[in-house]
Amino acid sequence: MRLNQLRRLLSRLLNKPEQTSEEDTGMNYLVAGLGNIGAEYASTRHNMGFMVLDAWAQASNTVFKTERYGDIAEVSFKGRKFYLLKPSTYMNLSGNAVRYWMDKLKLPLENLIVVCDDLNLPFGTIRMRKNGSDGGHNGLKDIQARLETTQWARIRVGIGNNFARGGQVDYVIGDLSAEEKAAVPGICDRVIEGIRNFSTIGPDRAMNLLNVKPQNGEKGV
């Protein structure tokens, strides 16, 4: 007898409502937005991952709770549950938080999505990939090391590279310009839609929809 059949039989015998096992459905996802904790980093380019998750939680009228290795919020969409993780480990140790929560939630790698900034993309450009290299991003590099694989999805949000030689660090932890800040809500909306599509229509179709050039004026800079 299959496990689900046995559950239904026991539910009837015990006169209890039948429950669906979340682990069996595969409808749970971990969305890790990368950034650095602290008010001084809140509006910096390197915190684009945090900004996306904050926007999603706010739109869903939910709040983050401080848990081990990070802040966690839960949002739902069409029967899917998304655990939004903002690691408290600082960027370079993001893998500790992602590995812990993947194990705790017992999720397969295909149900992990990481959102981060990318210097190699123009500001506002968004790219989703099912797998790939770290691209020089220290947060992705640590996640790759902790998970011992590159077979997990990531969404890169372009922050541009408008800095002089040797100025990379100051640029990524520098505040967004006024024009960039004005564009952030639209960027967050597109990323959130992309993640929802990832869970409903699959990664390939989600990538085709998300990985398009922004329309005129969409980047805001």
Segments predicted by a language model, with ranges:
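Nucleotide and nucleotide-moiety/phosphate-recognizing core
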Residues: 2-131, 141-155, 162-167, 174, ...
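Hydrophobic alpha-helical segments within soluble ligand-binding/sensing domains
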Residues: 136-139
